[in-house]
């Protein structure tokens, strides 16, 4: 395949040291960053959409992010995935991404035999618009097929009850794995993100019901991540999000891994700063094996509610070690669909991914993303 890199505006490269578990970049720094940026990332991404969404070859090289895609028109029929087709799609994608001839060697690139693997899903929107159980089943069956123990696999999201409502408890029982809610697992008092923004604590938050000075300023990381899981695989759908642009991997890992995150939704700028900073906590980001986009169906309107009338069947899966690049490409596709439907594009949310790149979480500049479709 021919390799293409899209020559748009150059990338501003800034690095920030991450110290401990308090990743609070001062607002003055962010304002300075925004002033010195010479181009609008939103404009850049909108301009790059038509070319970047075409099949492109490429390999990970230097500061470039590598994203692989597989499509199959037989993967979904009347909004129902074909589990066998999806299983083969994933295995083909995994082998191609790792440049391995067999599935076992491909998994060995990411997972060690002793790892406890957490598969992060989005269950709030249900099994049609959220992470589809057929995709999760494909990943788990692939792991089991190479001898990995089901006792070392946990399907997780914020709340166990939502996993049950979406049918993940039955899937877990059938495959011999388990499910867990990060909120239900409890929170680690020693690992947290602190910001001087106080919101209303809700039931399930670690400090809920307490009335002391300083309460509500910390977002604690779940013990599921600090004490149980050693590797995380994220599987999120291509679903729009009104603050984050896409309910993808950066937003999903940050909001799924900590409590007291609703306070950031009150201010767009603060949300765009806090979400990448939370995602950068080592107990979250450092455990990522890879991220997978469930793009069997793309929903461009509705956020956590399922609206098939605002959905497009793509029959596609995408994989990368770079969650930021995946989210940027998903946002671009969602914006393309919104534009075709006469809806306003998400523009301001691109700042979230620019901030994530400044924290070295991934690549947000489309000229540094190599996108390859294997079929």
Put a short name on every predicted segment.
Residues 50-113, 126, 130-137, 144-375:
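Extended, low-polarity segments enriched in aliphatic/aromatic residues
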Residues 43-46, 339:
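Hydrophobic alpha-helical membrane context
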Residues 1-31:
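N-terminal secretory signal peptides that target proteins for export/translocation
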Residues 23-26, 41, 48:
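Residue-level detector of bioactive/disordered segments in secreted/extracellular proteins
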Residues 34-44:
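Bacterial N-terminal signal peptides
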């Amino acid at each position: 395949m021919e390799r293409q890199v899209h020559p748009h505006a150059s990338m501003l490269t800034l690095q920030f040291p991450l110290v401990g578990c308090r990743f609070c970049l001062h607002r003055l720094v962010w304002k300075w960053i925004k002033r010195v940026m010479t181009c609008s990332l939103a404009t850049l991404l909108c301009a790059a959409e038509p070319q970047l969404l075409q099949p492109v070859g490429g390999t990970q090289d230097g500061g470039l992010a590598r994203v692989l895609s597989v499509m199959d028109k037989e993967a979904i029929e009347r909004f129902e995935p074909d589990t066998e087709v999806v299983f083969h799609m994933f295995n083909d994608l995994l082998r191609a991404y790792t440049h391995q001839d067999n599935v076992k060697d491909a998994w060995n690139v990411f997972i060690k035999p002793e790892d406890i693997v957490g598969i992060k899903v989005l269950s709030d929107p249900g099994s049609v618009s959220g992470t589809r159980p057929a995709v999760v089943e494909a990943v788990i069956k692939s792991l089991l097929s190479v001898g990995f123990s089901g006792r070392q696999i946990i399907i997780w999201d914020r709340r166990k009850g939502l996993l049950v409502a979406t049918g993940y408890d039955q899937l877990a029982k059938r495959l011999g794995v388990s499910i867990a809610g990060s909120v239900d697992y409890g929170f680690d008092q020693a690992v947290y993100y602190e910001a001087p923004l106080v919101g209303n604590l809700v039931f399930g938050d670690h400090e809920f019901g307490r009335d002391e000075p300083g309460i509500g300023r910390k977002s604690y990381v779940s013990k599921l991540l600090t004490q149980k899981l050693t590797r995380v695989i994220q599987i999120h759908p291509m679903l729009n999000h009104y603050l984050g642009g896409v309910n993808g991997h950066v937003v999903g890992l940050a909001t799924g891994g900590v409590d007291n995150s609703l306070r950031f939704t009150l201010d767009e700028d603060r949300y765009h700063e806090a979400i990448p900073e939370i995602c950068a906590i080592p107990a979250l980001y450092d455990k990522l094996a890879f991220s997978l986009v469930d793009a069997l169906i793309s929903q461009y309107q509705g956020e956590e509610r399922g609206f098939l009338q605002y959905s497009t069947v793509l029959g596609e899966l995408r994989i990368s070690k770079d969650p930021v690049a995946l989210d940027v490409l998903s946002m671009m596709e969602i914006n393309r669909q919104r534009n075709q439907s006469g809806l306003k594009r998400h523009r301001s949310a691109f700042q979230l991914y620019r901030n994530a790149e400044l924290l070295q979480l991934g690549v947000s500049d489309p000229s540094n993303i190599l996108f390859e479709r294997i079929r």
